[in-house]
UniProtKB/Swiss-Prot annotation:
A GO CC annotation given for this chain: extracellular region
Signal peptide: none
Similarity-based family: Belongs to the frog skin active peptide (FSAP) family. Tryptophillin subfamily.
Protein name: Tryptophyllin-T2-8
Organism this protein belongs to: Pithecopus azureus
Cystine residue pairs: none
Keywords: Amidation, Amphibian defense peptide, Secreted
Location in or out of the cell: Secreted
Presence of the UniProt keyword Ribonucleoprotein in the record: no
GO terms under biological process: defense response
């Protein structure tokens, strides 16, 4: 998911 990257 784009908000669970780093």
């Amino acid at each position: 998911k784009p908000w669970e990257r780093e």
